[in-house]
Amino acid sequence: MKMVSRITAIGLAGVAICYLGLSGYVWYHDNKRSKQADVQASAVSENNKVLGFLREKGCDYCHTPSAELPAYYYIPGAKQLMDYDIKLGYKSFNLEAVRAALLADKPVSQSDLNKIEWVMQYETMPPTRYTALHWAGKVSDEERAEILAWIAKQRAEYYASNDTAPEHRNEPVQPIPQKLPTDAQKVALGFALYHDPRLSADSTISCAHCHALNAGGVDGRKTSIGVGGAVGPINAPTVFNSVFNVEQFWDGRAATLQDQAGGPPLNPIEMASKSWDEIIAKLEKDPQLKTQFLEVYPQGFSGENITDAIAEFEKTLITPDSPFDKWLRGDENALTAQQKKGYQLFKDNKCATCHGGIILGGRSFEPLGLKKDFNFGEITAADIGRMNVTKEERDKLRQKVPGLRNVALTAPYFHRGDVPTLDGAVKLMLRYQVGKELPQEDVDDIVAFLHSLNGVYTPYMQDKQ
């Protein structure tokens, strides 16, 4: 028995020595790299402090594509575990945009701020299996508070609106502004062109055909129907509040509203016109429209001018004054108790990490299936998403995060339009993005909160402009 105990003790001592030796090497490696010169590349001391924190904690190991890894990465077993962490970490969050913004003294994106805030608040990063070896990676309460204070400062400086109540200025979301500056004459033209079916090949389909302003800015179909009954490959996103998207279309292939407006008229399975010349030839026959157009655009009809006018009109398609916006502005009675609970659950369960900002989304491109692989079945070109634009492998199956404003009015959901209810959409997100299930009562509370995002659209009245 004594011999067994002695062998066990020797074995444990050996393990401890190996662990301490490896941890000591890792500490030396981490400490050395944290002092490298590029951490000091920003001209702003506060930015340098954040950059130093990210480097010291080793965030770039898993959240950038090309970090220098420690020597123990090549040990069998450790390599497989680290490869898994790196793959999941880089898929979930790319730190490069944050570093670039800090180095250039520019605002960090809201979606990135929201993600960093969540892992700081809930103390999920760095994970325990990482800090077990990387002692320098542990985050102290003081460091956590400093990062959260930096996030609050970024929000206050770059994102918070002046009419947000003081107690809500550090929320991961902001209210929709009451109006945006626009050119009234261009808006009038854009309104007419948005509803003009002559932009389509057979003069039967207008922009409003798939983006109805009396139906949540969508057509309510799984995918849209184009000229001649052609079936589109993807669900039509709402036109309301699209001005707040970082880029347009699910895959972000259009940088601006104007770029987006130029897509459907020439798309063979949407409006199917062969060229702008074909469209202009029809518009030229309308003397009233032509006169009105020349007053605003003396050079006359062109694809650029037509889409410029439509984009200007689309800037008016915003929906402020939802119950949630009123709450953000200080009306505590604007939300029910259930909706307030739902909003807290929305934040607790990471929803706001992607669905933040003014429209609770529209600011980043994310993959479906962070915690569990999503079964797409046969993958289509539309499913490929952002990769169609960037050609980057990391962007495969990523879509622009849809905004949640008026989401109760825009079923069916997701880019395939294959989820008919909000209840189903919430449960799918929880399962595949968060990796959990919630009691039905909690799901109901989140759905109730989502209903509070229904805003007010004031229809454009052309005769009053």
From Swiss-Prot:
Instruction: Spell out the SUPFAM superfamilies in the cross-references.
Output: Cytochrome c
Consequence of substituting M82A: No change in activity using either ABTS2(-) or hydroquinone as electron donor
Residues where heme c 2 binds: C207, C210, H211
* Listed Gene3D superfamilies: Cytochrome c-like domain (1.10.760.10)
**EC numbers on record:** 1.11.1.-
Q: Where are the transmembrane segments?
A: 7-27
What the entry lists under InterPro entries is as follows: Cyt_c-like_dom, Cyt_c-like_dom_sf, Cytochrome_c_Peroxidase/MauG, Di-haem_cyt_c_peroxidsae, Haem-bd
Q: How is the cofactor bound?
A: Binds 3 heme c groups covalently per subunit. The P heme (heme c 2) is always high-spin 6-coordinated with a water-derived molecule as distal axial ligand. The NT and E hemes are both His-Met 6-coordinated. The Ccm pathway is probably the source of the c-type hemes.
Citing just one GO molecular function, the answer is: metal ion binding
Q: What pH dependence is recorded for this entry?
A: Optimum pH is 7.0.
Q: Where is the protein found, in the record's own terms? A: Cell inner membrane
Q: Where is the Cytochrome c domain?
A: 42-155, 185-287, 337-454
Side Cytoplasmic, residues: 1-6
Chief location: membrane
Keyword Heme annotated: yes
One of its Pfam families is: Haem_bd
Subunit and interaction comment: The recombinant enzyme lacking its transmembrane domain is a monomer in solution.
Domain comment, in the record's words? Is a non-classical bacterial peroxidase that contains three c-type heme binding motifs (-CXXCH-). Contains a C-terminal domain (residues 171-465), which is homologous to the classical bacterial peroxidases and binds two hemes (P heme and E heme), and an additional N-terminal heme binding domain (residues 42-155), which binds one heme (NT heme).
Q: What is this protein called?
A: Cytochrome c peroxidase Ccp
Q: Which organism is it from?
A: Escherichia coli (strain K12)
Q: What is the name of the gene encoding this protein? A: ccp
